[in-house]
Amino acid sequence: GEGVRSYDAGEIWHLLDTRYKIPISKLDVGDLSYIDLSRYSHIILPDYSEGSQYQADGGGINVDQIKNYIKNGGNLIAYRNSVKWVSNNLSEIEFHTNEINADNVNFSERQNFYGAQQTGGAIFNSKIDKSHPINYGIESNYLPLFRNSNVYMTKSKQSFNNPIVYSSNPLMSGYISEENLSLLEISTPFKVIRSGKGKILLMTDNTNFRAFWFGTNRILLNMLFHSNIM
């Protein structure tokens, strides 16, 4: 639908339909009100463009319909900026935010100033709890993650609710500003929110990047097949 990033939607589609032969339904967010969602075990919200209609006023999505779907046992998976949509419409989430102010930056340099705070694509190391269902099948205690967003969720106070955390000195490749790196180090890329009989599963990093970042594909599959025990 309008505002959904086609790259992200296509990456998810390719992974499930082409690589794993799992049939999916591609639904326009504006058409959900006309669809019986009880047919589906999971709904996946890909990333969206900030400032799009998808971000505002529920983005044309019938929010009550989604709430009822989850409470009755459905599962919602939200990626990257869609995590913000969940926070605005379904369940409040705490975020760390970059509050940097321009100091000695003139008007002609403003685009470079803001551009330096964007994380266009970088690789970060994470430490995982292999006993948690989100990490089933991963043999190492560490998992490199591909990140191209500036969404930083706060960690849970209960350590067992943080099955994926960034390691110390997490930057492995790419660029991130010092300000955002400090936020990343105290954030978690994954959360589970329980609501009624269902769950909301949140992921701020891209587990399916361009059909070659295979190491984290298992994260999405575990959200699909093991959400009932998370």
PLM regions: where:
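Generic recognition of flexible, low-complexity loop/linker segments
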Residues: 13, 29-34, 64-66, 112-113, ...
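Metal-dependent peptidase/peptidase-like ectodomains
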Residues: 127-164
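C-terminal, active-site-flanking charged/polar segments
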Residues: 44, 75-77, 95-97, 217-229
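Conserved beta-strand scaffold positions in the cores of enzyme catalytic domains, especially
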Residues: 24-26, 76, 123, 163, ...
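Helical hinge/lid and interdomain linker segments adjacent to catalytic or ligand-binding clefts
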Residues: 2-94, 210
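A glycine-rich, often tryptophan-bearing local segment used as a flexible ligand/cofactor-contacting loop or short
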Residues: 55-140
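Extracellular ligand-binding/catalytic regions of CAZymes and related secreted enzymes
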Residues: 18, 22, 133, 139, ...
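Extended, composition-driven regions rather than compact fold-specific motifs
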Residues: 91-93, 97-98, 155, 192-195
